[in-house]
Amino acid sequence: ENVMEPSPDSLVAIARGIDDPRFGLCLDIGHANTVVIQTPPLDWLEPMRPYLRHVHLHDNHGHLDEHLPLGDGSMPIPALLDALSALPDVTITLENQSVAPSLQYLSAHGYL
């Protein structure tokens, strides 16, 4: 899982070096957004794509790891969800302090 890396490069290099189908990466979208100055969250998906197995999904304002409900921060949630829909084998965990508002957001925007 990415924690505070400025880009996906080091994680991709590790996965490439291990080169084992049992090994995969977890992308925490909210963590990626806390280092947005270096690599925006959407830009993490493509390089990680061959190794991506799981995503932690929550929102924030780009500074703190707030774990806000989807739509309560500044992240491009619709664009992220659209990009994730192209990765049907990747599982997603909602990592919000309260999941109900995120489920309402997903339903209101046609994702559920």
At which residue positions do the language-model features occur?
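Catalytic cores of phosphodiester-bond-cleaving enzymes
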Residues: 1-2, 107
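Histidine-acidic metal/acid-base catalytic patches
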Residues: 8-112
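Conserved anion-binding
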Residues: 2-3, 10
